[in-house]
């Protein structure tokens, strides 16, 4: 009205209430409503209840005054000609009295509140007579009920059978357009109540169907919005209701009908001319809305009626694309496959009520017909409505309406019929309808609620058809109907009805059993075919439908998925008995199918191939990394959990028929999109982990897919960049890279890495020999590179072990990471473990690790490494695969062990190297995980989680590379070193790979395999260390070789596989395998079941049976064998095994389950144990090598003793992985002290490192322990399991830990994974340690390894390669954590993860959150004999280490703090062991390491103390007691454990282990610490050493020889095997406790304990001034400000800097939010106060 057109008329409007008069130009051709709005806008005063003001035409010329009906045109009311200007009043709508019936007093008396309330009650009670009486007295019915806001007319409109009441009210002066307080008219109310009778009456009384409510919405809009019986919708449309009303968001009725799936309303709207192309404010048409909200029926109607499916919304998306984005693939397919030839426009014309005056309607009608005419070909403007309805008026737009009608027909023919019939069919006019209304007023089950109405009228005239029904819809009679009129047919419940057409009045025409006729629409209900599909369809069918888009290219036009090329194929795999299928399976873990999972083009199924061995069985069958499993042996597995799929694969035996879908991005998408197309990032995983979230949030998932694409690109780029670093890996992983999805963390460029290193004082990657390490580098790089690359990318490679574990624990594993390419970057790290530290990927990344813990790559690597290691010794070859598989845990590792083995050797000159390279491609049959599957079936199955760890599918190659590397470095055993399959998961943690690798074979080989020149070996070890992946793979794979171990062995899992080379089945297998290996060692060259001759880890050459390495391997094997029984109980942990935890984790977390993992790391042969040491060795190979002879001896002796007391060894390894650790430790020990270690696999791992023949010739101190050690050893397996559990625990703490680790460059999960293996390797590290040590093989680094080269490795390599050196622990922890998180053992594993985050270096790793769940387990194991068991071992191993550590600690000042704590725990068995360890500590190598070990021990002890404090044990006894056998402070040990244990929180894992078990748990935390320790890296030798010292002390105690301590320290120190039960127990509790808080209670006795600070974390146990930057990061995490951690660490902010930080400093550090700064300052004040 504001801008009236040429026809505008000037009208004088008086507003009596405001005593104003306005002259306004109003448009006579517009509705009165528009004029009213014009007036309201012109007012300068607000009116109360303005909506109920109306334009009143005063009486004139004998005519009574009246209010103008708002929906009629202004020109319908002739102006008063008595005045010069037309005059209208704007006044509140009151009853208009024909004459002054009553005076004011009487009026006031009538309208009292009581009377008005009484009047409303009369209306409510249908008291028509009383209502009429009051109205006759002059009561004005236009008022609001003070309570409900209703007015009498609106209330009556909601009542059934209120026709008479409505008439009385209307005649009594009620305004039809009077609105309730909510702004609704009676017509709106009747429509919303679906009261067709009342609506009909109101319309008959002259109400307009187009009254607007307070939002300007019409009754028709409300009808489409509310759904239910479509009769009201039909009545309104029939009465010329206006179409196209839009709300504030531009939604029209058609949009709302589609939004809520009101098909019949939609059909009616379309029939009456609704614009199918109408777009809302976002540009979405009704079809877009259907696509978005998955309303398939509505979409079919729209398409059938000719909707344009090519219209794009304002985001330039078609409906098809919207459907894809929303994850509604079935609907997307419907849209995609719809053809124009399928369109059937309405052939009929809509009927209209003729009673409406054309004046008002003409305006309305005209536009409507036009609308329809545009789309209707059959528009016959004049076609009268055949229906006898009140007054059907046919408009030109009837054709349009016809079209709509047809659509509606399809939808709900009956609804309209009923509605119209009532009014038009002669049913008896509106009144009749009204009765029917009540019946049909409620929402009818069927489309036509009016059906009751129709029956109401006795004489039913002939039904009139409105339009044809949409074909393809199925209806079933839900209630019986008996014919009551002409042409009607009877219906019986349950009959299938074919609807032919939609008639008037809610009647539909249909056919039932040959009978054709009319029936009420509400008698039938539509049955969604889709529902049937989902109910009866197998997942396979669903998958077929889902992927049809891919195959038919239906997604081609979808931008989001246009970059995906979906290719489905059926592969038939036939393998030999002892080989695998050659692929690693990864995916979500779930006991039951995850129905919430919605396949997307990028992530079509939950399980996918994380890696495929090149030239393996699967490869030859055409399977490739990243392929999603749709069917396995004919069973649809799109939504099936990992374990079940593994079970299906195993059930098939040697034959496997898999239907897979390859999702690849189109090459054209060169841009960022070309990343990893296949698996969505981890959306499903999230969905995996949080399955409902990711999987269900289609849009989110879509976004994640896009993100993934970006990541993919990153991976590709990374691969491109990495080749320069190591082309090998690039080649091997190039495919993986593409296939594997990388975590979304940002990529770190080499430059950034360098700067990171510089910042952290770590040697740059270039410094790391690993990267350039001869053949190994690339091999290593495959797995490690990924990690490194991920690190470089800023994304931690998925820490397969940890992350996966966590993830696996609950959730779908992330899609295959197409991040294999990233490994190249990790390769850098590989070369330098320090990078591990340096690239602290974003916490997210680190946490990605949680997700990533599911890294297939790592898993694969682990498996591969193990296999490789084992491979060197003949039997080991096959076993490795199973172990590797186990490691893969969640992922079915179907790679052949042999190939892995082959790969590992590649770097080294021995025969192994060639094989390793092979393995990298993983072509050989043995490589096939399935080959292992046979033997490890159970384990594999159970290990689904562990397997999962091998998360990077692509990484499998990397694993192989790692194996090659390991083989190279470790020689034959090297592969064992390579057993850090974890490492293979490049995504796990960039930094970790190095550690893993280093630990893996090389260090081991150097230490025990003398074949390679010491320096060369050391160098190799170092490289390997850097490329933990490689070594890890070797070690793990090597270890796992136990053929006996069924892949599915539940508890055995990877650790077990690793541990048991096949000597036994199940967990025992794992242990036995080490034992077997040991036996062969003892027996002679062929000591291990895997191979009579052990192969040098570094050189790959057969070891001289008498050589320390061979002895250590043999001892380890023996220990494993002895442990086997203990392990067998681990089946409980089978879930853990399933979870792809780190090897160590496996062993630690679940001795049996995980045991294989650890075992591989400590493979019965030297390879098995090598991993632990190897990892350490990798870091400290040089040192280790140097120490190799003597250190090894003493260490080995220690370890041997420890080995005897597997618990101790396990404990040592415990941190790493309880089961694994012992295995690793034992293996290491065995290696050094060949036969002697047989009983103590753990010890072997721990001792093997330092002592060539720990078992054979236990050192003075160690020998005493051997007995207990053995006992421990036996129990240790249980403990080991306990350790394993922690990995599962990747809870928030874990997350933090991971984050921290990532930041530090140690990614806990991978590290854990690696740790499991690395730890194993590190023990052998003493000899190789020097080699590995990035920092020169100096006594000090060694000393960091305190008792054994481990310390050295830790100190040098570990520091340089935090991942490497601390990796063993960290990795162990990670592994554990991973296992834990992934596995059912999550409770235990969780702790581990957390723990490992914080400890070393202030490192996040330590105790970020000791797995809490493990707590209980830890405790029970602690109490159990295992602890005792472990204690001897611990004491032995730990004592020797601790002694040495103590020595150093004392010198460093660590001893005092750590000493007390340690003894406390250790005091029980520890004291005994301690005595031995003291002697052990005399070992030259360990001595050098001692200071570091002590510091680490001290740090750990401090943490433990803190934890212990919670337990009530002395907080600071820590290192000193730990180191000092005399000090029998189990609590101290426990504390250490706690700190470490927290990390590994494996305490509870091995309940069977008894005290040893407790110790095992301890070890687990230790694993965490190792990571931390590793974190320090060469850059922070002091803190690292200190941490390491602590770790070494604990670890040392755990593994007698210095070699092991660092590695073991990490795992062991926490576990403090020496302190068997008590320590373990305490640790366990502490761990659990710590897990959240971290070992803050422990003060930081160790000088280098900087990292520890905070009750549960290392930092909590140190004074603020001693905090390292990692402690600061942990502390930030603890106050929930972890997002600032990266910046703080980048700026090298240490504890001493915190108090001096100013506001400007905080801003520079990224703390821009005042609240965050205040929180930090408050927390600092609290620290000061405390």
Curated annotation (Swiss-Prot):
Tissue expression: In brain, highly expressed in striatum, thalamus, hippocampus and granule cells of the cerebellum.
ANK repeat residue intervals: 148-178, 182-211, 215-245, 249-278, 282-311, 315-345
Phosphotyrosine modified-residue sites: 122, 555, 930
The keyword Membrane is assigned to this record: no
Keywords attached to this entry: Actin-binding, ANK repeat, Cell projection, Coiled coil, Cytoplasm, Methylation, Phosphoprotein, Repeat, SH3 domain, Synapse
Segments of skewed composition (Polar residues): 1122-1131, 1495-1505
Domain PDZ: 570-664
Annotated spans, Disordered: 354-466, 664-688, 760-1460, 1475-1524, 1546-1584, 1627-1663
Record's compositionally biased regions (Pro residues): 444-460, 812-844, 1251-1261, 1321-1333, 1638-1648
Region called Required for interaction with ABI1, residue ranges: 677-684
Subunit and partners: May homomultimerize via its SAM domain. Interacts with BAIAP2, DBNL and SLC17A7/VGLUT1. Interacts with DLGAP1/GKAP, GRM1/MGLUR1, GRM5/MGLUR5 and LZTS3 C-termini via its PDZ domain. Interacts with ABI1, HOMER1, HOMER2, HOMER3 and CTTN/cortactin SH3 domain. Is part of a complex with DLG4/PSD-95 and DLGAP1/GKAP. Interacts (via PDZ domain) with the GRIA1 subunit of the AMPA receptor (via PDZ-binding motif). Interacts with WASF1 and CYFIP2; the interactions mediate the association of SHANK3 with the WAVE1 complex.
Entry protein name: SH3 and multiple ankyrin repeat domains protein 3
